[in-house]
């Protein structure tokens, strides 16, 4: 398992332990991708997982660029169109500095995505 897949698996376990239900992993469409899609009660949650081993090129949060946010929004719209309805939604980010649960930061309702 590569580091990205390991980070996504760790994030999924972390969110599930906090009551979210993982609906889908690695949702892809032309031009977009979402790492995790989950349910938090009635809210559909689109989750971006970011792993940074060091901060030489910025933090995990800083690595969510404008282009990445556009791809997330595109994939979310595609997913909702396939779903055929639009439940309440939000975008979250799970940030990891290492592949350990003690180094996880969960940002709910990230603005700008």
Give names to the regions the model predicted.
Residues 21, 44, 88:
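Hydrophobic "anchor" residues on beta-strands that sit immediately upstream
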Residues 82-113:
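Domain-level recognition of nuclease-like catalytic cores that cleave nucleotide substrates
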Residues 67:
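Aromatic- and charge-enriched substrate-recognition/interaction segments
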Residues 61, 81-82:
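Gly/Pro/Ser/Thr-rich low-complexity, intrinsically disordered segments predominantly at protein N-termini
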Residues 30-32, 100:
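Short acidic/glycine-enriched loop/turn segments that link adjacent beta-strands
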Residues 15, 34-55, 59-60, 64, ...:
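Conserved catalytic cores of phosphodiester-cleaving nucleases, focusing on short active-site segments
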């Amino acid at each position: 398992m590569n580091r990205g897949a390991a980070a996504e698996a760790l994030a999924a376990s972390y969110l599930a332990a906090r009551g979210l239900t993982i609906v889908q992993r690695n949702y892809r469409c032309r031009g977009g991708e979402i790492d995790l899609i989950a349910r938090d009660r009635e809210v559909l949650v689109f989750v971006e997982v970011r792993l940074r081993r060091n901060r030489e090129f910025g933090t995990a949060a800083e690595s969510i660029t404008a282009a990445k946010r556009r791809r997330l929004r595109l994939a979310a719209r595609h997913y909702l169109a396939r779903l055929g309805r639009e439940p309440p939604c939000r975008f979250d980010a799970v940030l990891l500095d290492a592949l350990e649960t003690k180094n996880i930061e969960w940002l709910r309702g990230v603005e700008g995505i």
